Amino acid sequence: EDTRHKSYEAEYVERFHAIISWVHGVFSEFHSRFIGKSSPVHFFWGSFDLAVTRFNGEKAPPRNGADYITREAYSHKNISHGFWCGGGAVLEPAFYGYSAPEPDGFKQAIALPSEAFYHKDLNEFVLPYEAIRKSDSPEKALLDFMQSIYEAAANLADWKREELERPKAQAVS
């Protein structure tokens, strides 16, 4: 039994819960705009990130050297978005967006808002949480980030968007 790591700072846990709850709401709105196969908004306990993924229904090329779980997770073409607390190559809380497989030209795509950038070590777009926190319209800024990544990847990869997206007037929260 782990008795050494059982303490925590309640203030930080409560702040994290408030942030992740808000992010879940925005991710759910983004999720509602898609009628193709998608994951629910879900929390990865291993990497401690909240994510939502859209699939286009096509098989992806196999990932050489990938373990079983990774092979299964990326068996079909997808565009994924998430939020994590940071660590490794990004030392601050941030949102991310990527396409698997990554279509040609994706690295050069324009992501919104202007604080978003392509992280060459992670092969994904990153938007610092601080940029969203300071935004005049945080929900709009986050939805713009997610939509801009999705549109860039889906267009470059020739997804059949008209078959996968809910008409704007029918978006459901």
Model-derived segments and their meaning:
Residues 57, 88, 104, 132-134:
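Generic "edge-of-domain/loop-turn" microfeature
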Residues 117-173:
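TerminUS-proximal long segments
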